[in-house]
UniProtKB/Swiss-Prot annotation:
<keyword id="KW-0210">Decarboxylase</keyword>
<keyword id="KW-0949">S-adenosyl-L-methionine</keyword>
<dbReference type="InterPro" id="IPR016067">
    <property type="entry name" value="S-AdoMet_deCO2ase_core"/>
</dbReference>
<keyword id="KW-0068">Autocatalytic cleavage</keyword>
<comment type="function">
    <text>Catalyzes the decarboxylation of S-adenosylmethionine to S-adenosylmethioninamine (dcAdoMet), the propylamine donor required for the synthesis of the polyamines spermine and spermidine from the diamine putrescine.</text>
</comment>
<protein>
    <recommendedName>
        <fullName>S-adenosylmethionine decarboxylase proenzyme</fullName>
        <ecNumber>4.1.1.50</ecNumber>
    </recommendedName>
</protein>
<comment type="similarity">
    <text>Belongs to the prokaryotic AdoMetDC family. Type 2 subfamily.</text>
</comment>
<keyword id="KW-0865">Zymogen</keyword>
<feature type="active site" description="Schiff-base intermediate with substrate; via pyruvic acid">
    <location>
        <position position="112"/>
    </location>
</feature>
<keyword id="KW-0670">Pyruvate</keyword>
<feature type="modified residue" description="Pyruvic acid (Ser); by autocatalysis">
    <location>
        <position position="112"/>
    </location>
</feature>
<dbReference type="GO" id="GO:0008295">
    <property type="term" value="P:spermidine biosynthetic process"/>
</dbReference>
<dbReference type="GO" id="GO:0005829">
    <property type="term" value="C:cytosol"/>
</dbReference>
<comment type="subunit">
    <text>Heterooctamer of four alpha and four beta chains arranged as a tetramer of alpha/beta heterodimers.</text>
</comment>
<keyword id="KW-0704">Schiff base</keyword>
<dbReference type="GO" id="GO:0004014">
    <property type="term" value="F:adenosylmethionine decarboxylase activity"/>
</dbReference>
<dbReference type="Pfam" id="PF02675">
    <property type="entry name" value="AdoMet_dc"/>
</dbReference>
């Protein structure tokens, strides 16, 4: 897409929102309570603030304000307001390619925000525990928040990721013509590294004419040892391992497809 000469400020709003899910199996109620306490500590407001502050550093944004809160009995939320440093729009990379990792600082944001909310929970009797984090990066200006995606996926390793990217509003060029998007995009997947793409099954649902893009990701690799809390596979019988594996895979597939599957 050729460079646009705008009349005034770039008024497009670009928002990336995604949910990440982490699944585990905890056999007893005490283990499930311990998992909730563990994940609540691992992703408390202070830790989330560090992650989001690092995100701001990566994309070159100035932090204006931080609001954070831990909740009782569990969960946390952090919202950071950020602003853009002075920059030349011709230096901005809006091409469809993966964003930076922590060692590559190349972007800026405008009057924008980054926020995260966490939701740990457990099945009342089935041993399944899940942790969900909702993250949103919203920008006004020339920069796409998709440049923060690659870092966050690496930072928050997950079993399932669902993402939505949307561009709202319009900006006007010097001739008065309205533009409803200022960069080319065919899929959110194009902003991920090949390494990430190789690790996940992915599915797109895009509405191009509405500038709405949706991608789901489900981890390909399944190792039971990675999903057990306070236990190891060696402590389980073959029948128990098969049953727990079935429960975990069913839970992962249900969350990925967004529907409950029949019990077999």
């Amino acid at each position: 897409m050729h460079k646009l000469k705008l009349h005034g400020f770039n008024n497009l709003t670009k928002s990336l929102s995604f949910c990440i899910y982490d699944i585990c199996y905890a056999k007893s109620q005490a283990d499930r309570d311990s998992y909730i306490a563990y994940i609540d500590e691992q992703y408390n407001a202070n830790r989330l603030t560090e992650i989001l502050s690092e995100t701001c550093s990566i994309i070159g944004a100035n932090i204006l304000n931080i609001a954070r809160q831990d909740y009782d009995p569990q969960g946390a939320s952090v919202t950071i307001l950020v602003s853009e440093e002075p920059m030349d729009p011709k230096d901005v990379d809006n091409t469809e390619n993966p964003g930076p990792l922590p060692d590559s600082v190349v972007a800026h944001l405008d009057k924008s925000h980054i926020c995260v909310h966490t939701y740990p929970e457990s099945h009342p009797g089935g041993g399944i525990c899940t942790f969900r984090a909702d993250i949103e990066v919203s920008t006004c200006g020339v920069i796409s928040p998709l440049k923060a995606l690659n870092y966050l996926i690496h930072k928050l390793e997950s079993d399932i990721v669902t993402m939505d990217y949307r561009v709202r509003g319009f900006t006007r060029d010097v001739n008065g013509m309205k533009h409803y998007i200022d960069h080319e995009i065919s899929s959110i997947q194009n902003y991920m590294t090949e390494e990430v793409q190789s690790q996940y099954y992915m599915m797109d649902v895009n509405i191009y004419q509405e500038n709405l893009f949706h991608t789901k990701m489900m981890l390909k690799r399944f190792d039971l040892n990675d999903y057990l809390f306070n236990a190891t596979p060696e402590q389980l019988s073959e029948a128990e391992k098969q049953e727990i594996t079935h429960l975990l895979k069913k839970e992962i597939q249900e969350i990925y497809y967004g529907r409950n599957l029949p019990t077999v």
